[in-house]
Structures are given as structure tokens and as C-alpha cells.
């Protein structure tokens, strides 16, 4: 299991990432911005997600500026940060990568918004695609954590619909990534995570029929 998945958002970042100056600064800035936010899956500190994305990119051999963008990839969507803040602190390349994987909230409708995001990422280059893949791996893992609550919790129909929409987006994202980054270990890892999720869906469907 990745080191990142054990830190609970409270311990120091791994030594391997501390040696990357831009990443180190980005992780600390992200922790400040995401303070008090929690993950939907399990109520853990939200910072676990960008930390995991950064670590996945590090393991895949991404350069410092891409890993830093991984740490910051949700700050435009989920905090008060604006692109100018990122350009000032981390440079235009990091800011552009974060923007490439940030949704346009002006687009109404889940499917339309996610479709626009995939097109945006596809046009943003290989580094943005790597970042997008790492994000989807982490999100797929979170969706797996949610499965128990979806199966047993209140509001089951709404939760099931949301899960189906998210899984469809992840599958379409995988298809894009397989086309653009066919040899990336991140893409292979995403495929494995989605296979695991699909098996869980099949098991729940069989249980419901019985």
C-alpha cells in the first residue's frame, strides 16, 4: 500500500518528496488551502487526495513541477485560490497544469462538464494527461471506499446514480488515456482500479437479485 494512504493527512510528507523543492512548497500550500475539508468517502482530511496524487506522479517518474501540480490540482475548484496565486508562487507551467485539470463550473450538467474536462485535458499535453491519470486513480480508490455506504446507507437510489455517473466518467477518461498515453504505468494502474470497481458493481447487483 502506498505510504501516502497511511498518513491520514497529519504527518510530514515523505522524505522523497521533501527533496523536491517545488513539490515540498506545493504540498504545504495545498494543506493550508484545504484545511478543514474532508473526503466524501470516509471523512478523512481532504489533503489525503492531493498528497496521493503527488505521490503517484512521483512513483511514475514525473518531474518536480508536475508533482507540484498534482499537489495543487484541486485548489482552483475547491478553495479560494485563483490562477494568479499559483503563477506567482509556482510559475506559469504549474498554474497551466492545474488549470488543465480544473473543471469549468460555468458548464451546466454533470455529463457536459466532465466531457468538456476530458477534451480540455486531451488538448493540454502529456504532462496534463499524467496528472489526470493520477487524479483518477485516487478518485477510483475513494469510490471503492464509498461502496459499503452506497450499498447500505440512506438515499440509496441517488447514491447509486451518482456512483454510476462517476464510474462512466472514469471509464471514458481511461479510454482517452489509453489512446494518448498507452505505455504509461499510471494508465495501467487506473485500468486495474476500474476493473476492481466493476467487479464490485457486479457483486452488488448479484446480491440485490438474490
Q: Residue ranges of each PLM-predicted region?
A:
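Active-site helical microenvironments for divalent-metal-assisted chemistry
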Residues: 1-210
Amino acid at each position: 500500500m502506498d505510504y501516502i494512504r497511511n498518513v491520514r493527512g497529519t504527518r510530514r510528507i515523505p522524505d522523497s518528496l521533501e527533496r523536491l523543492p517545488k513539490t515540498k512548497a506545493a504540498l504545504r500550500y495545498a494543506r493550508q488551502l484545504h484545511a478543514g475539508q474532508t473526503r466524501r468517502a470516509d471523512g478523512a482530511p481532504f489533503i489525503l487526495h492531493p498528497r496521493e496524487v503527488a505521490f503517484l506522479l512521483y512513483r511514475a517518474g514525473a518531474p518536480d513541477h508536475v508533482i507540484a501540480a498534482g499537489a495543487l490540482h484541486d485548489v482552483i475548484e475547491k478553495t479560494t485560490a485563483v490562477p494568479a496565486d499559483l503563477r506567482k508562487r509556482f510559475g506559469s507551467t504549474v498554474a497551466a497544469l492545474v488549470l488543465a485539470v480544473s473543471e469549468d463550473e460555468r458548464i451546466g450538467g454533470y455529463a457536459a462538464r466532465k466531457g468538456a474536462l476530458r477534451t480540455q485535458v486531451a488538448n493540454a499535453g502529456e504532462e496534463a494527461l499524467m496528472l489526470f491519470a493520477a487524479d483518477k486513480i485516487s478518485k477510483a480508490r475513494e469510490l471503492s471506499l464509498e461502496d459499503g455506504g452506497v450499498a447500505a446507507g440512506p438515499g440509496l437510489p441517488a447514491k447509486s446514480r451518482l456512483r454510476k455517473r462517476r464510474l462512466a466518467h472514469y471509464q471514458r477518461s481511461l479510454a482517452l488515456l489509453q489512446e494518448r498515453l498507452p505505455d504509461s504505468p499510471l494508465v495501467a494502474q487506473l485500468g486495474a482500479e476500474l476493473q476492481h470497481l466493476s467487479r464490485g458493481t457486479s457483486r452488488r447487483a448479484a446480491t440485490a437479485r438474490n
